[in-house]
């Protein structure tokens, strides 16, 4: 018993000591179906999309999350809700084990009293006792198995939900370095291993401890001298298991890490399979995958070799123990210090010690895997969101949509992105932003939505510092349409409805699609709005995906609308129609980020960024008269037709 307790505590105290997570019960409402497989992959891959569209800030989760640095033996943080069920399950297990202990005693009575003593009238009662014990053992065994299966499912599901919910609270800076494949491995594979350890393996550990305790008690009751032999055997196996775990610890950490790498490679390759084929890189991708797959194979073979090296010792001790007991017990019978029935019972008890000793190697293996997985998961739980609501965060009664940047500077990973940015947009007005790639255009929107906080200066919405507003209200007030559209594997209707939390009717959905110039191609499809689009919108053209994304934004009807180069894949005619539609949104503040002059020439003011600074600002006509960067961009885009286009753009701006 002492050896098994030592084994269990060694893994869950020493290997997973420092963190345990307590989460608000509200996370239990997250459907389990949102976690595994492609759904989890889409949600993790679409973090930006979720933040842009969500009417509720992810920070709504993080305020309820507390990371407690406690010993892992206080895992009752998770099992606390089910403590009565655990007690009932352990009680059923104990009852089944007690009944198991009766078999050898009945056998002893049959040998000593019936066979040797000649009391044949006891045989019927003893056989009835065997039947009753067997029936009771079946009932309690079934209840034990069922209870632990249910508990493991509930706790494993809760851990997975809590981990996924915690990931949703993390700031954008975390996802700058994290990758989807690794997070998928943590949420799915690593949680499965912990689930197994807290469920089936945990049940076996408890069962082994109780079983061995009662067996040793019964053995000592028969002969304390003979009982020292199985006690020594258990001590030997326990020490061997601890030594084996130390060898497995590093291996399982490497296996967990390599599994995440393999998942990342597979996820990235499948997501970008068209790019791979376009560049004829299939051979390179196969070789890259095979290289990591070989390392994964080698690590698993190392783990197997360790198991193979140690496992025979557990088996040998388990098989040799009954034989040893038969020999030593036989000597005691010959000397008259032990009855034959007691010897038979003792041998049966020694056989009951066999399977726990043989299981030690297997339990060590699974607990080592779970400990390594827990370390990986713990690092995610210990991550804290950099961006969070202040305790005195303000909730505005009504958001009008005025936006202001006052001396804003921002650096990321030591690189200066924005320097002293100043501008203001009144509600309902339109601001155009142009500049070369990497000039800081998109960073302005990240700061406006508080994906990051500015290093200097102030970003304001309706005159309020965005850091003083709740993230939920701030992000639900700003709708962003990205150039890189993220669509989910669902119907077109559901992809459009995603932008608004309240239920939308088909009339509103069709209206949004019509205004986004998407109704034409949608209604030509066989299933129209019920058409299920593939992962990330596969099967749709870039322009079609952008139009669905614009429809989703229009359905949301936020006070501030940001178009981040979101018409780049549209033809000129469709783009002009959308520009006309945007011009009619008098109650919506519009920020249009683009590379094409045609997308911003109608704006009330245009900013031209260069190296993180505002190099030029003004209306289209004013910037053309300056003959600076904006003017040269116009000339480069329209060439010989620049004169005519300038006239057309002037009319359009008016």
Residues covered by each model-derived region:
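Alpha-helical transmembrane segments
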Residues: 96, 100-104, 132-152, 233-248, ...
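ABC-type nucleotide-binding domain
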Residues: 63-66, 389, 396-654
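An intracellular "coupling" helix at the cytosolic face of ABC transporter transmembrane type-1 domains
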Residues: 172-173, 189-198, 202, 206, ...
